[in-house]
Amino acid sequence: MYRPNEQDNGMSLTRVLIAIGLSIAFFAIYAYFFPQKPHQNTHQAHTAQNTQDTQESIQASTHTEINTQVAPHQNIQDSTQSVQNEISSSAQMPHSLKQTIIARVDSDEFELEIDALGRIKQVYLKDEKFIRHEQTSLFAMIGEVLGMKPAHKEKRDKLPLFGDSQLHTMEMRFSDTSINQQAFDTPYTANISYIKLENAPVEIVLTQNLGNLVIKKYLTIHPNLAYDVRLELSKPNIEYFVSNGMRPTADTDTYAFRGVITRNNIDGVLTKFEDGDASSDYLAKNAADIRSSSFVASVDRYYTSLFFSNAPKGLYVVMSGDNAHNPMPYVRFEGDAEFAGYIGPKEYHELQGIENTLTDVVEYGRITFFAKPLFLLLEYLYDLCGNWGWAIVLLTLIVRIVLYPLTYKGMVSMQKLKDLAPKMKDLQTRYKDDPQKLQIHMMDLYKKHGANPLGGCLPLILQIPVFFAIYRVLHNAVELKSSAWILWITDLSAIDPYFVLPVLMGVSMYISQKLTPSNFTDPMQEKIFKMLPWVFTIFFIIFPFPAGLVLYWTINNVFSIIQQISINKIMEGKKAKEIAAHHDEKTNKRG
């Protein structure tokens, strides 16, 4: 009885190993590119702590870091001490000043609140797109059905972007301890308490009178949530720091980057400070890179609070961290100052319209260089068809067309391997005791018939970076939030609520696999290979992906099936012609 040796099933084993390797690589790369943080909103945890304990922790763990980065022309020890005293004074912020709202700006799109400390305390978004909240966890759904976890489906007419007790936008701190404490004890006044924003910008003037020092903040707020800032101090040479605030807390997604991004004003290099990673060592290591920044942005998955400047020297950014190592950004000024800011969704063209460099705030991770043009292509397709779901279908078609030459070669190569299987088996029987000769004859056989045992894997390998880039685009692009496709798919950025797409994806993957030629000699290898569609299906259900991504994968499988059927017909036609030609040749010889 014939028993295949190592050379017998070497090529089929290679294909199985590559397929399994790609599957493992898929999960490994996914974990690498999209590491999941513990599902804990560190800002909310920060809020829940006692204020005094929090401020003592900030003073102990982060103040020195900020001080070593500010005012390099000063004596470092003096600078460190002054800013340390300044930050520690925040523990004495009167609770009433933090809670008192002195001005409101209201529009159809948003509502903005300014408190008695002269800070932008809260921004509410009113668009239905941002108010909607989809369930994003299979386990949460199951728990809700079983009554193990209460549903959080509170109805709201606006979305708050920030937590209550975090570092807020436009918060000022002074190096001079006495000025700093007095500033925290003295409320601001506003020239107007309520403004209805229509189509034109509005200006709010905030004034703080400290006796020997008068501070004026001129905020010009635009309808798109961009704003211009002009700071005037009645005394010159006063060193102070203004924060763009800690990141918004409206989105609790744990796969997206959350923290602070700065862009170097000279070379455009981005420096990132992720929540939980802003240790003193990391802050010190990156201190020099952020001292001249074109922008500093606190970001979560969909939203940002940022400062930017077109000044030649940019913004002098200094960074601290709270007790949970979440970044706390500041910009250093001395005397009067002017800059601009923005609070709101990270919509690409909105940011581009404000300042072109702000598009770097839309962060797609390590593959941004590939994901950003992919998003622009997807957006172009959306402009053509008016639906993000159909845009994904068109994008998938374009990807398949671009990869078709390689896909065709790979599929033809796999068909040739299947056709050569009897000859390969004959060689394996003939040279079973001489592996070296077997290898030589097999290579000659491949060369003679133009077959490549690895050719079928190349198209799949090339699709992996496309897959991850599309994942980042669909997961991070706020433009797709709450965007419906058809029927039950009401949000392409959330999971399929009924898991229909993951099942269809698995079925289409199985059909594609059945149509693809195979030349397995080991039944175990074949079984393992056939399990892959179900492994992927289960993975897509237990660890759910956005519906848009599963749609891409499913449509990709459908196009693959169509391509495979057409290629199979082409190959069958070629075979029929070869058989007919061979038959004619024999007939002619007999004649």
Swiss-Prot record:
The chain crosses the membrane at residues 16-36, 388-408, 450-470, 485-505, 531-551. Disulfide bonds: none annotated. GO terms for biological process: protein insertion into membrane; protein transport. GO terms for molecular function: membrane insertase activity. CDD domains: 5TM_YidC_Alb3, YidC_peri. GO terms for cellular component: plasma membrane. Pfam families: 60KD_IMP, YidC_periplas. It is found in: Cell inner membrane. It is a multi-pass membrane protein. Keywords: Cell inner membrane, Cell membrane, Chaperone, Membrane, Protein transport, Transmembrane, Transmembrane helix, Transport. HAMAP family: YidC_type1. Belongs to the OXA1/ALB3/YidC family. Type 1 subfamily. Interacts with the Sec translocase complex via SecD. Specifically interacts with transmembrane segments of nascent integral membrane proteins during membrane integration. Required for the insertion and/or proper folding and/or complex formation of integral membrane proteins into the membrane. Involved in integration of membrane proteins that insert both dependently and independently of the Sec translocase complex, as well as at least some lipoproteins. Aids folding of multispanning membrane proteins. This is Membrane protein insertase YidC. It comes from Helicobacter hepaticus (strain ATCC 51449 / 3B1). The gene is yidC.
